[in-house]
Amino acid sequence: DRVRVEYFNAKGNINSFLRKQSACNIIFRTAIVKAHHIRFNENLNTYVDWSFVLEYMKYVNKFVRIFNFPFYFRGEVYDPFETLTLSEQNFDILFKDYVNSFYDAIKRATNPKVREFIVTKMGNKIANEFEPTRYDINERYQTHKDTLVELSKFLHVHLVKNQKLINKIETILLMNNETDKAFKVNQFRKTLRHVKNIVLRRKNKERSLYDLTDKEDNVKPKTIVFESFGGKNYSDSPKYIYEYMQKYYPNYRYIWSFKNPDKNVVPGSAEKVKRNSAEYYQAYSEASHWVSNARTPLYLNKKENQTYIQTWHGTPLKRLANDMKVVRMPGTTTPKYKRNFNRETSRWDYLISPNRYSTEIFRSAFWMDEERILEIGYPRNDVLVNRANDQEYLNEIRTHLNLPSDKKVIMYAPTWRDDEFVSKGKYLFELKIDLDNLYKELGDDYVILLRMHYLISNALDLSGYENFAIDVSNYNDVSELFLISDCLITDYSSVMFDYGILKRPQFFFAYDIDKYDKGLRGFYMNYMEDLPGPIYTEPYGLAKELKNLDKVQQQYQEKIDAFYDRFCSVDNGKASQYIGDLIHKDIKEQ
């Protein structure tokens, strides 16, 4: 946009002059500033600008504002727990400073309209910061109740005149120093809002019912709720834990959460619930144990008498959460992402780790103390240990996928790119592997399975390669795909660690290695030295090497073995049993 300069009447355009509580983008005459010794109030820390602007307003009738001009760039905060911008400090510090700024501004304001504007701003600040649905509202109210009493007395005329009846009652109680009753009214406002959602049958009525009725007494000890990849499918470690428990503890109540329950078949007696339905919220309210392999929504209230088992979904190669320097994802910032992730991991009672390498990373990336980490291997990998040589089982998988029995199977499973997003939670992926060249080189003897990351939203166009390339992105069990694959091609995906259990050839197609290592996530390990197979940045050399699997196996055997020892040796085929028995024991002790 073009730089735009506009002139305003200082007395008539109060909102334009003061609305952002900032002196930025306003041109001040230095002669006036010097003549009247106008300065920022050094007793304020964050909300200092009004102290300068209001003094300046006393001596001018007009002012100039510049739009669309980048006066400065503010660097991004990478660790919101150690380094904060002024606006991201602890709420208690910020609110105290805002209140001090308000009183300072009131003293400086001589124009009645300016005073009214400042008072309105303070009223809006209270309404926003002490909104009854805030997760820490109880702590906020108790910490600042004396300040709220003082402000209510000062602002009562404005507040009572502009508030709804229920808000007026809260204000009057604060004015009379009855803070406990005022807080009850504050929470009653939330209750009324939920009741209104339910009565009017609004879209979020199920969530409102959950918020109103969820309590510790709801928890039923023999109820376990499972979810995989945010309800996408019946898969991964939660699947294998469930199947073990269904077999050995059939009398428990099992619930699976799905986005589309009708599209997922779950063996046994499990109930299926639709995500965000009334049954979904009831399941999470009643279950004594939650089992998930990815983050669950923060609006689900994990109570003290509930146990949350986080299986996670891979050995980390790319930096995670707290270890990421910069977060480039839609709908969030680095500080916001890390704070929300921290809130999530604080709810985990147990986190499954597949190896010592991962345990050390999880402690840092997820703010986890080691007592909560179970270093037992991934339940989803039990099948890789127990059935790798079960030929009848392998034939069943191949038959299900209609794979020719006389051809070798290549699996291509790339990861997603943080910066290639279309919207929050949805990412694009451009196939760079050159299917045409692979088909020409390998089509007679191989088929290739294409497995995109679960966050990838765009469908693959495989027109012309129907008998060679097969999209298995929606195949629920990736472990079964590993079992029938003669080799794996990946880039920075954690599938390399799971596939390493089989000690088969792996190829690494890292066409954007420089960007991914330095510009996006960064790696925990030495990518160029520690991998159990060759690395390619262009597709043609890759196609030639795929013809010689035995040669690659022999050439990299030492690295394959070292990779197995470091990352795969904990997997012993009994992780599902460990977690299933742990849950059973926990239930028995309740």
Cite the ranges covered by each PLM segment.
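Catalytic binding pocket for nucleotide-activated donors in carbohydrate/polymer assembly enzymes
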Residues: S463-N467, S494-F567
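Donor nucleotide-activated moiety binding/catalytic core segment of transferases
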Residues: V273-H289, R295, L449, Y454-F497
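Conserved nucleotide-sugar donor-binding catalytic segment
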Residues: F8-Q89
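N-terminal pre-catalytic "stem/leader" segment of glycosyltransferase-like enzymes
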Residues: I166-Y281
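A donor-sugar binding/catalytic signature common to diverse glycosyltransferases
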Residues: W290-R319, Y475-L520
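C-terminal subregions of glycosyltransferases and related glycan-biosynthesis enzymes
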Residues: N68-K203, K247, S569
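Conserved catalytic-core segment of nucleotide-activated headgroup transferases in glycan assembly
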Residues: N233-Q246, S364-A365, P379-L462, Y536-E538, ...
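A nucleotide-sugar donor-handling region in carbohydrate enzymes
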Residues: K318-F421
